Curated annotation (Swiss-Prot):
UniProt keyword list: Activator, Cytoplasm, DNA-binding, Metal-binding, Nucleus, Phosphoprotein, Repeat, Transcription, Transcription regulation, Zinc, Zinc-finger
Name used for this protein in its record: Zinc finger protein MSN2
One cellular-component annotation, GO: cytoplasm
Reported function: Positive transcriptional factor that acts as a component of the stress responsive system. Recognizes and binds to the stress response element (STRE) which is involved in the response to various forms of stress (heat, oxidative, osmotic, etc.). Involved in the regulation of the CTT1, DDR2, HSP12 genes. May be regulated via WHI2-PSR1 complex phosphatase activity.
Note: Present with 125 molecules/cell in log phase SD medium.
Disordered: region residues: 84-246, 418-437, 592-634
Segments of skewed composition (Polar residues): 113-133, 167-193, 204-220, 426-437
PROSITE patterns from the UniProt entry: ZINC_FINGER_C2H2_1, ZINC_FINGER_C2H2_2
Species: Saccharomyces cerevisiae (strain ATCC 204508 / S288c) (Baker's yeast)
Compositional bias ranges of the Low complexity kind: 141-166, 228-246, 593-608
Amino acid sequence: MTVDHDFNSEDILFPIESMSSIQYVENNNPNNINNDVIPYSLDIKNTVLDSADLNDIQNQETSLNLGLPPLSFDSPLPVTETIPSTTDNSLHLKADSNKNRDARTIENDSEIKSTNNASGSGANQYTTLTSPYPMNDILYNMNNPLQSPSPSSVPQNPTINPPINTASNETNLSPQTSNGNETLISPRAQQHTSIKDNRLSLPNGANSNLFIDTNPNNLNEKLRNQLNSDTNSYSNSISNSNSNSTGNLNSSYFNSLNIDSMLDDYVSSDLLLNDDDDDTNLSRRRFSDVITNQFPSMTNSRNSISHSLDLWNHPKINPSNRNTNLNITTNSTSSSNASPNTTTMNANADSNIAGNPKNNDATIDNELTQILNEYNMNFNDNLGTSTSGKNKSACPSSFDANAMTKINPSQQLQQQLNRVQHKQLTSSHNNSSTNMKSFNSDLYSRRQRASLPIIDDSLSYDLVNKQDEDPKNDMLPNSNLSSSQQFIKPSMILSDNASVIAKVATTGLSNDMPFLTEEGEQNANSTPNFDLSITQMNMAPLSPASSSSTSLATNHFYHHFPQQGHHTMNSKIGSSLRRRKSAVPLMGTVPLTNQQNNISSSSVNSTGNGAGVTKERRPSYRRKSMTPSRRSSVVIESTKELEEKPFHCHICPKSFKRSEHLKRHVRSVHSNERPFACHICDKKFSRSDNLSQHIKTHKKHGDI
């Protein structure tokens, strides 16, 4: 196995101290002879030898002027080629590739034969130049890093180093160090060696290749320092470090590089710890930006249809209008049949409250109630306009603060009854202050939704006595408003087939009402008399005083109602009410409910003249349980409707118009009878409509 190295461009300098002789291995196999060995020539310049070497060299016959004798690693030194002494410390070996290889081979063979004849022994011993032990260790570790031991630990063959052998004309150069000076040899050529070769062979022939050092100065310095130390310790350190072809020779060379300190400089724990100690806060996390506002934006819209339809063009009430309303209300109070002293006292007290600028509560209350009055639509406001001879009546359904503070609701109802009955009824006494407070709290707690039309009982009073009123007062609602303020709500648009009471509730009065014609009056005698009963839907049970006082107020109305001859109109109202109960909430809403609650605390004992009021027995109220959505709705029903239900349940007090309804009621509520059976799944039902609905499910699933 041959390892080739090119030394054409680099000079390898190595010491020759502690050189040993190399045993020549005779190879009897001619096939292993390597004829490609490049010969070397020895160029000696300024070589300094010790005294023993100088004496040996001076005894030779070779003169210095003969030039440089040839010398190669693959042949022993001839006797005639003596190394002269010079004044330099370096010995350079240079390759001479221009010489004839065949001539050198013949010369080497002749030298071998002469040497064998001179020694006369079986083992041919030659003395020649070789590399030092440290160099052998490096070469061995380069090619065989896993092998042990190193060549330095292998015992070498004994060599004979005679000073001068004149008989065989051989010279043995045993280089020694004199006074610390070293002799260096620099070979320069390509070397091909083989273990079993008849020429010069190193102890580790396979590992005889040299390495390249890119920094010769640093390498020479390390070699000089290391050669002064122990050879064995040096070889052990080299074998453990497994040095490669980078030119590093020992551990001290690695330590001189300070690789660990360089790594510590680049990756420092202090640098990592103190990295975020600056005040710039560049490495901290950026705070999140607030995208939405902290509070939602407030809009004017309530997201309801009623808000967008009712408030877009209502006129604003200025303080002058409020004062006018205050004066009108005071005049109407003084002109009523109520007690003059009580009315004057209330008007004066309220005017003082309204006129005092320091009373903030009263001012805020007036403004709030005025806004609520604008918010709710009142169709009874403009049924009659105030003239110089007549006073405008206060509307009980509107949220009027002046009306609430000047006149009690019971007095308002009494004034309306007196106006309808041509002031023939007596006024009632004023309520106590506690009743007034309870009425105000109930009024605000039961505020009606603005989108529903407000129709109170005063409308029916005006309808009954319309012929007795001034024709100038019969005007449509909102007739005095400007064109920009008049609008029609969607709930006011009715079809032509709508009932009369629905048209009155939405569009107001008109001259072509069928129940106000003369035909209606002619049919008054043929129409049976009936009574109207105001029912309160899903309200709390009234106290006995409440029911008696409410029936008393109703009796005032019916005491004079037959005298007007309007039974036909009332019958038509009742019949239309039965036909269209779900059309529009009729005849009173929250204000009427509040008035009834207020009436419960009032007691009408006598008239202004002291004459007692005749009490008549009327049918009691009948209450129905309704859904919470219609808790505040109030309707008018006649007693004739109650009499038209002859089929009474023997278990509960319910009555029905038809017997089928009674049977269905008994089957579904009071008994477990199931006469209607399904012919598909054998389920039984108490009602036929339930069976029909069940059969539809079978059709939907494809069972039929």
